[in-house]
């Protein structure tokens, strides 16, 4: 029982997940893998603990949506249920820490990948207009030593251009760069 002015022990644990980790009950080294440090594992564990609001050591769909939103990711209900379905290896309908870590490292990797694609886009968009034109593509082709005529370059733009304005926006470029197959 808690003394007057103190939280009950269970509430103290929930309010201080980092101390719980440092006390030896959680070993981040067990989850470290290439590209992921112990510090990053601890940060993700802290997020997990914060969003495991009922203290069950698992995150349900409602808790996952709040976690993803707070970490800056779009979290539509359909996406949340699909993530749980994809990651819930034990069929519980919830995500434990190992499953959460897998999800978050995939999302972090995706976010980093988008930043890398933005850098490549900026190389094409030399005037920083926010889109790639035939002129931009012609310049890059010339710099790379490619001998392509305007009709070939225009065909490339037409394939990437989703709204028919003869310009390739970053979203168009990103969609092409992340496509698994090309039609």
UniProtKB/Swiss-Prot annotation:
Ca(2+) 2 binds at residues 88, 90, 92, 94, 99. Residues 1-19 have a biased composition (Low complexity). CDD domains: EFh. Residues 39-74, 75-110, 112-147, 148-183 form the EF-hand domain. InterPro entries: CALM/Myosin/TropC-like, EF-hand-dom_pair, EF_Hand_1_Ca_BS, EF_hand_dom. Keywords: Calcium, Cytoplasm, Cytoskeleton, Metal-binding, Repeat. One of its GO terms (cellular component) is cytoskeleton. The gene is Icl1f. SMART domains: EFh (SM00054). Plays a fundamental role in microtubule organizing center structure and function. Component of the infraciliary lattice (ICL) and the ciliary basal bodies. Residues 1-30 are annotated as: Disordered. This is Caltractin ICL1f. It comes from Paramecium tetraurelia. Belongs to the centrin family. PROSITE patterns: EF_HAND_1 (PS00018), EF_HAND_2 (PS50222). Monomer. One of its GO terms (molecular function) is calcium ion binding. It is found in: Cytoplasm, Cytoskeleton. Ca(2+) 1 binds at residues 52, 54, 56, 58, 63.
């Amino acid at each position: 029982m808690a003394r007057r002015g103190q939280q009950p022990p269970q509430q103290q644990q929930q309010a201080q997940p980092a101390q719980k980790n440092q006390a030896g009950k959680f070993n981040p080294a067990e989850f470290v893998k290439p590209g992921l440090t112990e510090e990053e594992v601890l940060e993700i564990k802290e997020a997990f603990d914060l969003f495991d609001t009922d203290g069950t050591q698992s995150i349900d769909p409602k808790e996952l949506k709040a976690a993803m939103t707070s970490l800056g990711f779009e979290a539509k209900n359909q996406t949340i249920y699909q993530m749980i379905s994809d990651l819930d290896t034990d069929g519980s309908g919830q995500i434990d820490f190992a499953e959460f870590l897998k999800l978050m490292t995939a999302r972090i990797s995706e976010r980093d990948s988008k930043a890398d694609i933005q850098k490549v886009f900026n190389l094409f968009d030399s005037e920083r207009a926010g889109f790639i034109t035939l002129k931009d593509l012609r310049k890059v082709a010339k710099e790379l030593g490619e001998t392509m005529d305007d009709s070939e370059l225009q065909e490339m733009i037409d394939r990437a251009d989703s709204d028919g304005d003869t310009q390739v926006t970053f979203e168009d470029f990103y969609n092409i760069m992340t496509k698994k197959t090309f039609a």
